[in-house]
């Protein structure tokens, strides 16, 4: 794989003198990480999105790629039965999620004048069913309950009866994540001894008081250090941020309470694509692979529909795409991290992943928007 004249290229020589080239357009928002790149360097390109989250924008960070290519390592870090130890060593191999947790609460503690409230929910999409990894049974044990996707009155896609917990620190957030990971479906394959068989979606919901007057505006500008604010403005790999307009404020309620803004951060560790001839799966694992393949195909189909500006995007072809409808449809700033293998054996999956990245990068859905808190847009929900 080479980076030449602003283009990412991968060539396959079928026979001498022939070849297939897959290239990304010259794009300053595209970043390529080599094998020696640190987890801290990768997080450096994610960090500006936390500025957007604190400003009230929805954000989604998604790892995509074949099984065994490093998605879970990128999002979570090296596999361990123990949770991460905070505060983090900048040179540690912990991934994006624990780094997001620590940085988010560091930024919140710098200015608490906007009364921030943080809630966390964790689900997995397994065999095209959604399971709540924070739901508890009658004896308060976390059990992973099956849930359904619903659409709220304001049009937002949500999970009915989804358990969420308020958190006040990065350690508490990661404690919940670690507990949810213990329930995540896994199955060994010839490619990966600890292969995840589900899509993991961690949603961090941040509710803050809106900057509605000059005093609040000053507080908002003080939320981040100058260099962090400038980095947020110049953040890379922001498909939805181009041409973003200043979002409208959420009206206060009749009781005179302060205006509020609710923003969601979705951290997605997708299940990996795989070839049955390479992974060697049979039985239940084969069914899992088929469901994973269908959901990833549905994801590519939605991006294709958005890219071609079709009148209808098939979000409901998969629960994964239905659940991610808000961020895929242009309501969020979306960052996709493609994880690929350098092995010639996995060339077909590598080319497929790069093709997905090209499609995702070309989708333009207009400006991201702030969303009001659910308490101000509460309405009857209907199952889809």
Swiss-Prot record:
Keyword ATP-binding belongs to the record: yes
Region (Disordered): 1-20, 217-256, 362-384
Gene Ontology biological-process annotations: establishment of spindle orientation; microtubule-based movement; mitotic sister chromatid segregation; negative regulation of autophagy; negative regulation of mitotic centrosome separation; nucleus localization; organelle organization; protein homotetramerization
Gene Ontology MF terms in the entry: ATP binding; ATP hydrolysis activity; microtubule binding; microtubule motor activity; minus-end-directed microtubule motor activity
The Kinesin motor domain, residue ranges: 7-363
Domain of life: Eukaryota
Pfam families tied to this protein: Kinesin (PF00225)
InterPro entries: Kinesin-like_fam, Kinesin_motor_CS, Kinesin_motor_dom, Kinesin_motor_dom_sf, P-loop_NTPase
Compartment(s) where it occurs, according to its Swiss-Prot or TrEMBL record: Cytoplasm, Cytoskeleton, Microtubule organizing center, Centrosome
Residues involved in ATP binding: 65-72
GO cellular component: centrosome; cytoplasm; kinesin complex; microtubule
Keyword set, alphabetical order: ATP-binding, Cytoplasm, Cytoskeleton, Microtubule, Motor protein, Nucleotide-binding
Annotated disulfide bonds: none
Keyword DNA damage: no
Primary role: Minus-end microtubule-dependent motor protein. Acts as a negative regulator of centrosome separation required to prevent premature centrosome separation during interphase. Required to maintain a centered nucleus to ensure that the spindle is stably oriented at the onset of mitosis. May also act as a negative regulator of amino acid starvation-induced autophagy.
Family under the similarity heading: Belongs to the TRAFAC class myosin-kinesin ATPase superfamily. Kinesin family.
Assembly behavior: Homotetramer.
UniProt-recorded name of the protein: Kinesin-like protein KIF25
Source organism per UniProt: Homo sapiens
